[in-house]
């Protein structure tokens, strides 16, 4: 707004970044990687690049608009009977550990919470949306979507440019690629990582189908 005009509209959409973090896990312990100062640094970096791009843009008086949506239902992960038995045995554990990651009490509570939540919501509603402006499309989903899944949508989209907007119209937790379930932070089973393996690929397929129902105008600006 300072650079262009007070009535200049800014829309921020979070791309597919479920497996991206600003945290450098190899850095020294005293390196600050979160908080207002880090947020401002990242924000100014993005804003600076955006201003550079805007000065090079060609603007058009009009462009055709279209929108479509679809509601799908996904299967959540379910702790096994053995995992739940272990969880109930260790849920009261307050044994000190180096981090929450290795805390038995944390994981016990997480698995019990997930099991109870699944009884209330045996299927997870997932709203997908697609909006096109000319030959450019925006596709949204409510997950913390892994980069590779977003890139797959872009590669298969019929539009010249396709942008992903994650955590839109809800939050269904992390949505990893199928091979990411071999291990790691984002795919460790809990209420914030409740997607069954393969759900990410289902979202990709359904999003591409949604985009394919929309007409790409031949003579519209990109």
Predicted features along the sequence, with ranges:
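Non-catalytic substrate/cofactor recognition surfaces at enzyme active-site rims
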Residues: 1-222
